[in-house]
Amino acid sequence: AAKRFILHENIAESFLAKFSEAFRQVKIGDPLDESTTLGPLSSKDALDTLSKQVDEAVKNGATLHLGGKAVAREGNFFEPTILTGITRDNPAYFEEFFGPVAQIYVVKNDEEAIQLANDSHYGLGGAVFSQDIERAKRMASAIETGMVYINWLTDTAPELPFGGVKRSGFGRELSDLGIKEFVNQKLVVVHK
């Protein structure tokens, strides 16, 4: 799931307004109900961890733009949450949040965006949204992740290699690269 949203300053305010409205429209509920758009977290421990992460982020200077707490109902539900103003010295900057928490970062240019994107211990996937596809390709090449999607968030298919870099793993699953993970190759040399 997308967690860190790095926005150019020219679109940040407009994006945040539309994003916030979309989060307000999320329907929390039973994942078996087709009208539900956000189900529960996997466990009470996951809910407690996420609650502590958000509280700690705010305590360390992040702004709670929306949400930020467990939903008062049976189950392990957490409100769709948006955090802004996270600085590098905030623990949230380097943590992974496993739940509906979006971190918003604002940058002045592509170089800042790439530097911020790469300043992470993780690198499973990323996405670049742009009307300029050549610019997006340059950025995708510079982003340190195992997968980058342009104008799309994520996808999977048997023919697409899946995997990350840094603390998000080594090697690939799926595709011919995934099959090679299960092959032991042997070198045999005959000296003449």
Model-predicted segments: where are they?
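Aldehyde/semialdehyde dehydrogenase
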Residues: 1-80, 111-146
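Conserved C-terminal structural/oligomerization subdomain of aldehyde/semialdehyde dehydrogenase
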Residues: 27, 70, 77-192
